[in-house]
């Protein structure tokens, strides 16, 4: 039997990652995080690019060693071509092209957001893959999308955010509360001990299937500002309840439009993807939709945040369709879906 072995390389933001996938299954998925950004309260593009330059060679080598394969066994090299930070993308792109030349292997350009969705199609022992059509809620720091998947490579965005993404709403709310970056996971942590109904924040309801989270950020800002005028220790004394209330508002906003999309499409095979899909309440609420007769797919935590396994599985499907790139293409900070 002829195997298909893909090396995936991810460098769109602040994670340097490399993965080997063979016949749809992960042999390795190595990720190097960049903790340098924490003290700046967000990702600094120049620092991200420099860190990628330092990390990419050892990360790719580690992925190959961990997979237990030889370089000549790689059939193609898939790399993130966008969207993302252009300097960070250039590091992964340049390395992938150099490796392509040295190994004489074809290149595959991966769309970062489409790859997030395809993380659901990574094969594992005992795992059932989503049936098609598949409806996916992709939620990350920069994107919030409802995606209708007719085929793995045939994806259509039917709902998106018109301003801030859900991940931004988490991080901006966390910053207002004085929590360090990245704030989303900390809101999730403190929310575990809080009352989600203690404070009421607005749930946007713009027409159609699109989202808006900018109003929530403003509401949290004004709420905190007004409360600390009378009680300077308000945030410290009510942190768990504020976090739980903010998280409840974001997740209910996400689910309201997603359930509307389910009704409009009639699709019963559903799931989540992207970094925010690691949020405990979102996972719980999504899994509860199985009570409505849906098959619900929630990714492993390692496949939620940016990782190269999703790039490699995207490359796997592209390879099977003979969709290859070339050395002349350049990465793009913005990329049409």
Can you name each region flagged by the protein language model?
Residues 15-21, 136-138, 144-148:
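Short beta-strand scaffold segments in enzyme catalytic cores
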Residues 116-117, 299-337:
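Glycine-rich phosphate-binding/hydrolytic loop that grips phosphoryl groups
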Residues 109-110, 270, 287-311:
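Conserved phosphate-binding/catalytic loops in two-lobed NTP-binding clefts
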Residues 3-83, 112, 116:
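N-terminal beta-alpha supersecondary unit
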Residues 1-3, 110-134, 314:
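Conserved phosphate-binding catalytic cores of ATP/NTP-utilizing and phosphoryl-transfer enzymes
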Residues 79-105, 122-123, 280-289:
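Short Gly/Thr/Asp-enriched flexible loops that form oxyanion-binding sites at enzyme active sites
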Residues 111, 150-193, 217-226:
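Glycine-rich phosphate-binding loop plus the immediately following alpha-helix
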Residues 189-270, 279-288, 294, 319-322:
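A contiguous, well-structured pocket-lining segment that forms one wall/lid of small-molecule binding clefts
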